[in-house]
Amino acid sequence: MAIIPDKQDGTVLERQEKKLKPPSMYKVVLLNDDFTPMEFVVMVVQEYFNKDRETATQVMLKVHREGRGVCGVYTRDIASTKVEQVVTHARQAGHPLQCVMEEA
């Protein structure tokens, strides 16, 4: 805590130190469906989550086998943007791929 003299009346003010907490983090999750090709899921993971082909394939297999796969953990704004980008791309390509974000 810093002590700051007040030049007007000679009183001393104490500056409150602000405690900043880290931002909340969110998982971006792909959900399985019976129609989106596996290769499309791999491409999405590579393109939007900057994963190499091997990692993207592992995420795709997790989605396929377990019904869901985490692509990454991000701050709220970044996670929301990635979800929107993935869903938009999937719809433009004619696929029903679902992408959601959940608190980490």
Curated annotation (Swiss-Prot):
In the record, biological process GO terms are: protein catabolic process; proteolysis
Give the Gene3D superfamilies listed for this entry. Answer: 3.30.1390.10
Description of how the protein assembles with itself and partners? Binds to the N-terminal domain of the chaperone ClpA.
- Would you identify the family this protein belongs to, as annotated? Belongs to the ClpS family.
- PANTHER family xref list: ATP-DEPENDENT CLP PROTEASE ADAPTER PROTEIN CLPS, ATP-DEPENDENT CLP PROTEASE ADAPTER PROTEIN CLPS1, CHLOROPLASTIC
List, alphabetically, the HAMAP family matched: ClpS
The protein's name: ATP-dependent Clp protease adapter protein ClpS
Annotated organism of origin: Paraburkholderia phytofirmans (strain DSM 17436 / LMG 22146 / PsJN)
Upper lineage: Bacteria, Pseudomonadati, Pseudomonadota, Betaproteobacteria, Burkholderiales
